Amino acid sequence: MVIRGRAPLRVSFGGGGTDVAPFCEEQGGAIIGSTINKYAYCSIVPREDDQIIVHSLDFDMTVKYNVRENYVYDGRLDLVTAALNAMEIKKGCEVYLQCDAPPGSGLGTSSTVMVALLTAMARWKGVELDGYAMADLAYKVEREDLKIDGGYQD
């Protein structure tokens, strides 16, 4: 069985930066943007052991976790570590990640990868998250848990 998550990248036409605190909290914000037909992908293949093996195809990197240990941020695929913690994943699996655009492209890649990850994990766990709940969770994980700067549009 393969569980998949996919999320579209986005382009901002104007207003970028007005969605970043504290500006948006004090002044409000408005952005004109759209998703595009480029995506971040996540595939999860359950395993029968206690290992989580993550393959980042874009970074040509593999990271392993043991579900019996705490998932610790170590600078290697911390987006995945944060998603595992947020979704409380405690079953073995292989995770495959790929994105149609490179990090730093200005298309919201890290947030898009996070949404693809969380979508696949939620499907695997049988957790229903509507678009707003998914956006809130992805924002919390990236901005609050990982302390990654960015706005709401990401």
Write out the residue ranges for each language-model feature.
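ATP-binding N-lobe of GHMP and related small-molecule kinases
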Residues: 1-107, 119-131
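Short, conserved phosphate/pyrophosphate- and ester-handling motifs at nucleotide-, phospho-/glycolipid
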Residues: 110
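Active-site signature of alpha/beta-hydrolase-fold catalytic machinery across serine-
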Residues: 116
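Alpha/beta catalytic cores of group-transfer enzymes, especially the acyltransferase/condensing modules
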Residues: 129-154
